[in-house]
């Protein structure tokens, strides 16, 4: 969103690194050219599953040799009982941060069939199938995970 890009721009204004912040619809064709690093924070989970392979291939193709993708996503557990427990933990966390049960319920309903999480294995397989030579999990907390993928 423009507001998120503005905050990112403010946070990076003194950075000596070269960067480009882009607002795009990932369900459409994404043009990435000559990138050293691509970061997707809680983004791919909103891309329709049938479009995720082409999104990953576009990212892979747009990275320079040795480039990397940092992917952080909401994930679902391979074990349904754990998945439900993790979701409940997350709702408790939101309540502790001041959200009401109604707000939590409304957000969950709004994201139903829009946010479609995959398992850690499904995400890893997606990255491997796109051509990344190295894929590793660098972060996992309940139903959230971070991956690093190297070209």
Show where each model-derived region lies.
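A conserved beta-strand element that flanks and buttresses the S-adenosyl-L-methionine
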Residues: 39
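Core SAM-dependent methyltransferase catalytic element
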Residues: 124-151
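Short catalytic micro-motifs in class I SAM-dependent methyltransferases
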Residues: 42-45, 73
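A short glycine-rich, Lys/Arg-flanked "PGG" loop and its adjoining helix->strand segment in the class I
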Residues: 53-65
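Conserved beta-strand signature within the Rossmann-like core of class I S-adenosyl-L-methionine
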Residues: 66-74
